[in-house]
Amino acid sequence: MKNILHITLILFFSLTIFSCAKKSSDISISKISVQESSEVSSSTIKEIEGTWVTNCNTASWNKIHYVIETITVSGSAFLWKWDEYFDSSCSDVYMIWTNNYSSLSLTNEVTFDGGSKGSQFTMNVDSQEGLMKTEAAVKDYNNWNWCGFSDWVLNTAKDYSGIKCGNNESYPAINATVNGVYKLDESSLLITKDSTTSVGSTVFIKQ
């Protein structure tokens, strides 16, 4: 679903070029420079525990598709999921991307431009999987030979951790360390795992 890492794929029937960001991050990055940082207590991680979900948004990696992102934090376990859809109401699922991480810990508190606070974090990759939910997705990804796979089938996940895919985009290997940053504003969460000095513009709402 994931990124969350951008890949370029050629959509054979429409010649649409897009990058598969979810597995690294489907997030539109809003550049915010860090002015200062300090150590942060690991107990602060409790403030983001639970499930966070986005609205139905246009997928950044494929402008004719839509996505709902879900983040679930439980202790040091972190799940990031991207449900990809054909339609703007996000009712016709195309495929699901799921990244699982472990050993989540906070490293530094940061102050962004404007004075808002955030926290940098680190975690380890457990898995990064794609799950085809439609025959169209199976056909598309087999035709693309994405990540070297040409044997996708319905409802059978494939893990692409540590593989170079698309436009020479490499995905972190299992057990690799991923670093990111988040900013919490009451029940809204801005987060990215592709930078430690800027947060995404995609808003996650606490469920």
Annotate each predicted stretch with a short phrase.
Residues 1-18:
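Sec-dependent bacterial lipoprotein signal peptides
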Residues 190:
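Non-cytosolic coordination micro-motifs
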Residues 3-4, 32, 180, 184:
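N-terminal cationic leader/targeting segments used for protein routing and processing
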Residues 35-89:
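Short N-terminal edge-element motif at the start of the domain
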Residues 16-47:
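Bacterial Sec-dependent N-terminal signal peptides
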Residues 55-64, 79-186, 195-200, 205-207:
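Contiguous, well-ordered beta-strand patches that form the walls/edges
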